[in-house]
């Protein structure tokens, strides 16, 4: 596969072990992954919905797209907050074009008043980052059982899927990579 470049931008503190797992997982597909620990570490207050106590994911991504104009195939933001889009109570992540954001709050056991579990949290974050990376690279949702591109409506859905693309999704990424190489 031609190397496609992904930038991961942490907007809040993320444990190094989690970042390492994200890089390892995405790199295993031949993707080049860079990390930017953004010192500004903020989300636009104009995107915060005070009635819902959540960020409007579309507004956040529009804001971030205007601030990060780097030469990457995919730019993925990580934020330790809660997000939504119209029509949904929440989203784990959202992708628009080659930009994505993952909201980490609901991936933590503590959100559900359960005992903290860093290992489970790490697995969930890796799955959702890989999922949104797939979207930024042109993949849609997949119905293959266990594929990381399965839609997740609940954290239990996240737990059921693997952190890996199925064969069909890998094939699609490889074909896209070959197409981009010819351009």
Swiss-Prot record:
Spell out the HAMAP family in the cross-references.
Answer: Archaemetzincin
Catalytic residue list:
132 (proton acceptor)
Q: Which family does it belong to?
A: Belongs to the peptidase M54 family.
* The name this protein goes by in its record: Archaemetzincin
In short, the EC number is 3.4.-.-
A Pfam family this chain is assigned to: Peptidase_M54
> What species was this sequence derived from?
Saccharolobus islandicus (strain L.S.2.15 / Lassen #1) (Sulfolobus islandicus)
The record lists Zn(2+) 1 as bound by 131, 135, 141
One GO-annotated biological process of the protein: proteolysis
GO MF: metallopeptidase activity; zinc ion binding
Q: What does this protein do?
A: Probable zinc metalloprotease whose natural substrate is unknown.
Query: Sorted alphabetically, which NCBIfam families does this protein's record hold?
Result: archmetzin (NF033823)
Cofactor(s) demanded: Zn(2+)
**Enzyme class, spelled out:** hydrolase
The record's annotation in CDD domains points to: Peptidase_M54 (cd11375)
Write down how the cofactor binds this protein: Binds 2 Zn(2+) ions per subunit. One is catalytic, whereas the other seems to have a structural role.
Question: What interactions and quaternary structure are annotated?
Answer: Monomer.
Alphabetized, the UniProt keywords read: Hydrolase, Metal-binding, Metalloprotease, Protease, Zinc
Residues at which Zn(2+) 2 binds: 142, 147, 166, 169
The protein's superkingdom reads Archaea
